[in-house]
Amino acid sequence: MDLDDKDRTIITMYADDPDISQERIAQAIKLSQPSVAARVSRLRKAGALEKSVGISPLKMGLYLAKVDLASNEPDAILHMFRSCPYFANGFSVSGRHNLCLFFFSESVATLESIVNGHIRSNPSVKEVDFNIVITTERDFVVPARLRSERVEEPPCGMKGDCRRCPSFLEKKCMGCPATGQYQGSFYQP
């Protein structure tokens, strides 16, 4: 997609203030509001202007984990976490590690339990690097689903009952909010 200076200004103004009015943008780039609306529509259809609503884990006092790993089944790993309430996002990447995953929780021990119980224990995983994010330069927004329908089976596909897991019993893991087997406070009503 070719962007002109007005398109770049529109994108920048939305990046600086997602709630900015099209009227203000129109004044800044010297176009009518309907012309701005048409440009915004075109930019959105092309994927040049996206909106993401969610939570900022670090601002909320939650822990954010970055997990780099090497797996010979990266798509299966991504699929396993797709509906996990703790999963922020995942990326297929080049280099020694072929996946970069982000998770958030109110507990570092829960993040460690996810990594140890679902990633390190996975036979397709060859190497894992687990880190806690301390700060971000830009706001890191996660489109979190804090209210989801209860499910019988954990979204990660884990077999068994969280309540019987040693990490859960020792309060090292908060459990799975999706199944109701959860002992934390963040997802509680």
Stretches with model-predicted labels:
Residues 1-189:
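A compositional/biophysical signature of low hydrophobicity enriched in polar/charged and small residues
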